[in-house]
Regions:
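Bacterial Sec-dependent N-terminal signal peptides
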Residues: 1-23
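Glycoside hydrolase catalytic-domain context in secreted enzymes
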Residues: 18-533
């Protein structure tokens, strides 16, 4: 009797698995192209597709008219927790010594008339693509927003080299996660926490459409968005990056945003749309300590019903890729979890997109989590668990070590082929083989008034009135208004992170035509009526 019952249960499980339709319906012609390309690739070419490098390694930041601002140096060092002794010693250095020490980092240590210019090293780029077969590049140089023309030049050259040496286009990725945050002159939208507060999926979809258009205007086909980390702990520094704490809201918003970014057919994404990388799969927004990239401890029910659900909906909506949680869930690093990466996502949902790590996260399996003895062992664990692409920003060591693992039989060739098949599929779906570059003609609406109006509407609908004692709002003209607080006259607080620079630290320089809260109140009520303290 028990044997028969087990057999029936197993049979039902098999039938259920077989009945699960692919999250993205397969296109036979596209799949044939993927298989044909895959069959012609060498092991080196396949492994190169699985590596994503930071653009900074292909160029150099030069400084003209360099003059160090020592108060900025002091502030930067204190911000990053350096000791008083190190701060004191650094301030005694010459300007050039300070530049040599700190100039390579995305921090502002210069006086106002200093110019920082990033130059692409074509020889280095040539080597990385011709020798190491690198298939993906990311980021803005120095994490500071370039112009559209600069993006067209740099990504255009990357695609030229990729097609010349590999016959496979690069898939370039940027954190364009509340508008084109890494492109000057484009449209910034309110942060996702604001977009969630609108409860308006049409606004979210329209914002994604505009961001996709302006990303492609800058020749970028892939964005690291949407973010659907349930933000349930106000201590967590990245609450603003998601749609909030509710699984239903995040699920509804992520579907709308994916449709806006990618269009209605994920197999055929047109030149005005981009591929999405829904992140951070999953439970990244539930750190036990409240600090970023720290462990989550959750019940199985909470994991399945709440934290997994928005990602399930993203997969079913056709997101091309997902970025993985940097930390661990109940003691298991997500980058090492076959159950989470392969079974739940790729097998149970029949999702055929690819999984990319976050910044250098495979390294954490040995350096922080201690589940691997060294980097090579960490690569073995992560790739076998289901990671398809490693964001290993500064080194090609990944390629060397993964090849050794394949030759030693520790990573099966079938796993390599599966990963590369998924990456090629995404590139075909984006139309990159037919049109590696976009931008220029057809993208004249970049940064237009229509797009700005859509952003303003989203900002207005996101406003939540918490208190209005004595009906003081709306403010009457002709009265004195006290405005106080550290953010009252700063632009950075209005944008938040991922705004022109990684932490939004250069927002003042790149948003001069806009107003701070103080400036806006002065314009409306008269400077003589505003008291700033």
């Amino acid at each position: 009797m028990n044997t028969r019952l087990i057999a029936i249960v197993l049979g039902l499980t098999t039938i259920t698995a077989q009945a699960q339709k692919p999250a993205i319906p397969r296109d036979a012609a596209l799949e044939a192209k993927v298989e044909k390309k895959l069959a012609k690739m060498t092991l080196d070419e396949k492994i190169g597709q699985m590596l994503e490098l930071n653009l900074d390694v292909m160029g150099k930041m030069t400084v003209e008219n360099a003059k160090v601002d020592r108060e900025k140096v002091r502030s930067v060092l204190q911000q990053y927790g350096r000791s008083d002794a190190e701060v004191k010693a650094t301030l005694k250095m010459t300007d050039q010594e300070i530049i040599d020490k700190l100039g390579g980092f995305p921090v502002d240590i210069y006086q106002g008339d200093t110019k920082r210019l990033w130059k692409l090293n074509e020889t280095m780029l040539d080597t990385l693509i011709s020798k190491w077969k690198v298939g993906s590049i990311l980021n803005a140089p120095g994490t500071r927003a370039p112009s559209v023309d600069q993006w067209l030049q740099w990504i255009g050259l990357i695609q030229e080299k990729s097609m010349k040496y590999l016959g496979i286009p690069d898939i370039y990725g940027l954190d364009h996660n509340h508008g084109v945050t890494y492109t000057q002159g484009g449209t910034l939208f309110p942060q996702p926490i604001n977009m969630g507060a609108t409860f308006n999926t049409e606004l979210v979809k329209r914002g994604a459409e505009i961001t996709a258009y302006e990303s492609r205007a800058a020749n970028c086909p892939w964005v690291y968005n949407p973010v659907v980390d349930l933000s349930r702990d106000p201590r967590w520094a990245r609450v603003y990056e998601s749609f909030g704490e509710d699984a239903i809201v995040n699920s509804k918003m992520v579907v709308a945003e994916i449709k806006g970014y990618q269009g209605d057919d994920p197999n055929h994404i047109d030149r005005f749309r981009v591929g999405t990388s829904t992140k951070h799969y999953f439970a990244y927004g539930a750190p036990w300590t409240g600090k970023d990239r720290t462990p989550a401890y959750l019940s199985p029910q909470m994991i399945r019903e709440k934290y997994f659900e928005p990602f399930k909906q993203a997969a079913l909506a056709g997101t091309l890729t997902m970025m993985v949680n940097s930390s661990s869930i109940n003691g298991v690093p997500v980058h090492a979890s076959y159950e989470y990466l392969t079974k739940w996502l790729k097998e149970d949902l029949q999702w055929d997109g690819f999984l990319v790590t976050d910044w250098a996260d495979i390294n954490n399996l040995f350096s922080r989590e201690k589940v691997a003895k060294d980097k090579k062992d960490a690569i073995r664990i992560a790739i076998n668990a289901g990671i398809d692409m490693s964001m290993d920003p500064y080194s090609v060591e990944f390629c060397i070590l993964l090849k050794e693992l394949v030759e030693e039989g520790k990573v099966p060739m079938s796993r390599i082929d599966d990963a590369v098949r998924r990456i090629l599929r995404a590139k075909y779906r984006l139309g990159l083989f037919d049109e590696p570059n976009t931008g220029g003609k057809g993208f004249e609406k970049f940064g237009c008034d229509e797009f700005a109006a859509a952003s303003l509407k989203a900002a207005e609908e996101s406003e939540v009135l918490l208190k209005n004692e004595g009906n003081i709002l709306p403010l009457a003209k002709g009265k004195k208004i006290l405005l106080t607080g550290p953010n009252a006259n700063q632009m950075r607080c209005l944008h938040g992170g991922w705004s022109y620079t990684w932490q939004g630290s250069k927002a003042e320089d790149l948003s001069e035509k806009y107003n701070t809260i103080y400036e806006a109140l002065c314009n409306k009520y008269g400077r003589e009526n505003i008291i700033l303290e």
